[in-house]
Amino acid sequence: MPFTIDTKHMKMLMSLLFAALLANCGPALAETPAGRVTGGVAHSAPDWFKSSFLNFQDEVEEARRAGRHILVFMDLNDCPYCARMLDENFHRGENREYIRKNFDVIAVNVRGAQEVTWIDGATYTEQDLAIKLKVVGTPALVFIDPDGKKVLQLNGYRTPPTLRHALEYVHDKAYRDQSLSAYIEKKQQAPLYTFRGHPRFENVTDFARYHKPLAVIFEDKNCADCAGFHEKVLNHPDVLAELKPFRVVRLDAYAETPIVDISGARTTPRAWAASLGLTHRPGVVLFDEGKEAARVEGRLYHFHFKEMLRFVGGRHYQRYDRFSSYLADRQRDLLRQGVNIDFGE
């Protein structure tokens, strides 16, 4: 007599088999473990930073009477660049005493909620002030003269020698008649950097009417950070992958050779760098659809640099009004996918 199973028992058997299958395959079907963030560094401001109610009109008046400039140190919790710059220049190092002698240093957290009365009399939260000042990298250093005018802003980490140039530029009030790059060029005699090649570099002299993603890298012979940029960032595999949508051009920011810039104007690399207001070498300006979409004016480690490239190359800047907003969403997505994120060098 043939063996048969009625419908009721068949359903029960299938349920048992499915339960057994889930038990055996559970690990494979389990949710992907979240990724981890490494490379963040906790930091604290030195105790000699000025205690402030963040009313910068009052701070300017005090600085004016003392004949000093104000240095606003804008940082972010667990920022490795902030920690390094504080350690090398404010907690110790040759710049420490120079800064203490000549500047009133006031800390502002770019994600903070404290109320700030800025030099123009307007009131902001710390976070809104960072947006107003277009802070795209931390630390950002904002220098204010005794008359209450912003005279220089540095977005991103600077090495101690590079920062020293900026400190002396402000203290000497050289900002009255020249740019920071011109000031450095006059002071620096012996070249610090020999230009390096890269397989992605193209020789371009006419940038007009170019509407695809374009990365223009400005370097010069006095660039203290350019060699490290090539070694640790520009040749990193993750960065090379995000460079694929870009046409990449390196220009000597001191060169006087004729070129046509992105707007169609006849100019030179020197004049173009000056018109862009670049304060750092290497200065990386990212263009798309014939206009500037983002720039990098401080040292970034490979993760943040490749995400800046993706921000423009993937045209995410069309969806997000700020890189920081894009980056927050991007990091959440990567961690959700189980990707580890390394903020370190």
Task: Locate each region found by the language model.
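Short, well-ordered alpha-helix to beta-strand connector turns
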Residues: N102-F103, F246
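Positively charged n-region of N-terminal signal peptides that target proteins for export
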Residues: M1-L13
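Proteins that catalyze or organize thiol-disulfide redox chemistry
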Residues: T7, A28-I70, L76-E97, V110-R247, ...
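Bacterial N-terminal signal peptides
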Residues: S15-N24
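Hydrophobic residues within membrane-embedded alpha helices
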Residues: L13-M14, Q57
